[in-house]
């Protein structure tokens, strides 16, 4: 049976842990609010950009015009999956869920492509796939440290250049899509070639006057679209990470409080037993006299 000193030490240790998890929960809650605001502000712009591109591509296809290289379909032999994870842990199943989701995607598409490589954003994804001897072509570091649109733009530019050079035939983006503070949905979306199949059925029947031209707009908007897809994935992942960490720390804090209550009860019982024993010894000694 542990001594009173041992129990007191454990209670102090658990209390220190509770202070840490409670502080981390509060920090994550503050970061979540900012990240959630950024996601909600980005979604309408991304959706409108998708609709505009779909309309432009649909009209170009209807008039049998030459499509932009980022739209033109081609034989897909090689692919790359850009996996967005976090640099830090203590976020529940946030990282493991998306990594396992990507593993299933690789298995399901093994016959579709001759070769599928990985590019990781975040230390946890790199560690996960490296431990399983999966090929990692590129590890993007320092993106989460100071999240900025310019970093997403640089990543998108590199992916676009490799696609146009024929080094890869398809690029996918895997990330946790933010639903709520306690819910994230794993997603793998096609980044390149740009998918405009979301165009509505009556899009081809509606046209606008474009200046300077439809082709010039496509050439300008397509790179923006790719960069926006990457930026949105980074923001969605950041919000999901903070939500997952907040939930994990809330659960850890609750468990710590329950453990403190259990240890306190154990301490009181042990102390009561110790006092009873001391009293019994005193009474026995008095009777002996």
Swiss-Prot record:
InterPro entries: ATP_synth_F1_ATPase_gsu, ATP_synth_F1_gsu, ATP_synth_F1_gsu_CS. One of its GO terms (cellular component) is plasma membrane. Keywords: ATP synthesis, Cell inner membrane, Cell membrane, CF(1), Hydrogen ion transport, Ion transport, Membrane, Transport. PROSITE patterns: ATPASE_GAMMA. Its main location: membrane. One of its GO terms (biological process) is proton motive force-driven plasma membrane ATP synthesis. Signal peptide: none annotated. The keyword Membrane applies. It comes from the Bacteria. It is a peripheral membrane protein. It is found in: Cell inner membrane. One of its GO terms (molecular function) is proton-transporting ATP synthase activity, rotational mechanism. The keyword Protease does not apply. PANTHER family: ATP SYNTHASE GAMMA CHAIN, ATP SYNTHASE SUBUNIT GAMMA, MITOCHONDRIAL. Produces ATP from ADP in the presence of a proton gradient across the membrane. The gamma chain is believed to be important in regulating ATPase activity and the flow of protons through the CF(0) complex. Belongs to the ATPase gamma chain family. F-type ATPases have 2 components, CF(1) - the catalytic core - and CF(0) - the membrane proton channel. CF(1) has five subunits: alpha(3), beta(3), gamma(1), delta(1), epsilon(1). CF(0) has three main subunits: a, b and c. This is ATP synthase gamma chain. It comes from Anaeromyxobacter dehalogenans (strain 2CP-C).
